[in-house]
């Protein structure tokens, strides 16, 4: 059986939690392969319970599924324990959660540096969540990071923390005029936290490959979205990892020939959190109405999301760079009640019409959307469970987005509930 990649096709917050929850019903394994607790997703169960998850894969809510925090993820031990405690308090079985020994740990000094750096940048800030994600990935690339397996050997952990604080404290004290961190305090804190998750540490790369050899289905869950990818996103307003499908192999430890399909998640309109270019952004009442109707506030930060119309240029780009085979279109219900719905089909960049993503950062910043107006609908779509039950104009809207995006739309979300989904085709 296959490995299936699930990836956001916009700037994150597309509704990946619901898609993972749906696909997780046919998977035996759900693997988070990059990012950290800088992104969140909400899953609503049939009984009305909603769960906000930031680090743990949303497959944790499906009985019998083994969940993995992969080697490409950066793990804040405190957040991990808080999330586990929150799930267990609501009688969710967390015994089937494993953590890669090769994942990196977000240390207290990563969070401290992330927060003071953003404050120092002021209006020039990138808009990070201040969770220490970027500084942790910096240490990983510089080969001075602390890995999950290091908590199993206090001597190695202490050596790494001492070496790190020799430099980090210089930055905190001399550059930002902040108090330095104490080695013993950091080590003791992390070791104390590790006592509560050490039994979950495993060679997950081996276990995932063995599962595939047995014919089991593995769902590889990315966080954030394509346009936030450090290589393929709107750099420098991006995250520090590769949420695109190519990152799934590196972040989980499986080879590319294991992947059978790539499912992209598209919101029926577009949102973005933080700074950076956003060609279809609405700064008027229409944008505020979308924000309120869609509940567009970040799960992790609570920040208001920027809103705009659907952008087919970035959808086509996401299809190409991810090799997307199927799309899950979310929040179609939010557009109910609009007379017409603009869809961006191209950009005007300094007088030239382009239908593909501009090559340069300047080009993206100069992009002015070229819209096609589609007729809206007034009927309530939240109860539809087949494509044919949707209003004719809603069907036409979906078909047009499918045509513009370059991959079939196989599932459609018509509400926040787990059951409020239309499945048109079997995905992957």
Swiss-Prot record:
Coarsely, its chief localization is: cytoplasm
Which major enzyme category is it? ligase
What reactions does this protein catalyze?
IMP + L-aspartate + GTP = N(6)-(1,2-dicarboxyethyl)-AMP + GDP + phosphate + 2 H(+)
Biological process terms in GO annotation: 'de novo' AMP biosynthetic process; IMP metabolic process
Claim: Ligase is one of the keywords in the record: yes
Location of this chain's protein in the cell: Cytoplasm
Q: Which UniProt keywords apply?
A: Cytoplasm, GTP-binding, Ligase, Magnesium, Metal-binding, Nucleotide-binding, Purine biosynthesis
What Gene3D superfamilies has UniProt attached to this entry?
Answer: Adenylosuccinate Synthetase, subunit A, domain 1, Adenylosuccinate Synthetase, subunit A, domain 2, Adenylosuccinate Synthetase, subunit A, domain 3
UniProt-recorded Gene Ontology molecular function terms:
adenylosuccinate synthase activity; GTP binding; magnesium ion binding
Which residues are named in the active-site annotation? 13 (proton acceptor), 41 (proton donor)
Give the EC number(s) under which this enzyme is classified: 6.3.4.4
Task: One GO cellular component term, please give it.
Answer: cytoplasm
**SMART domains, per database record:** Adenylsucc_synt
Enumerate the cofactors the protein uses.
Mg(2+)
User: Which amino acids does the record list as binding substrate?
Assistant: 299-305
Functional pathway = Purine metabolism; AMP biosynthesis via de novo pathway; AMP from IMP: step 1/2
* Cofactor remark from the record: Binds 1 Mg(2+) ion per subunit.
User: Tell me, what does this protein do in biology?
Assistant: Plays an important role in the de novo pathway of purine nucleotide biosynthesis. Catalyzes the first committed step in the biosynthesis of AMP from IMP.
Instruction: Note the NCBIfam families from the entry.
Output: PRK01117.1, purA
Oligomeric state and interaction partners are given as: Homodimer.
Similarity remark = Belongs to the adenylosuccinate synthetase family.
- What is the protein name for this chain? Adenylosuccinate synthetase
Question: What species is given as this protein's source?
Answer: Saccharopolyspora erythraea (strain ATCC 11635 / DSM 40517 / JCM 4748 / NBRC 13426 / NCIMB 8594 / NRRL 2338)
Q: Name the gene for this chain.
A: purA
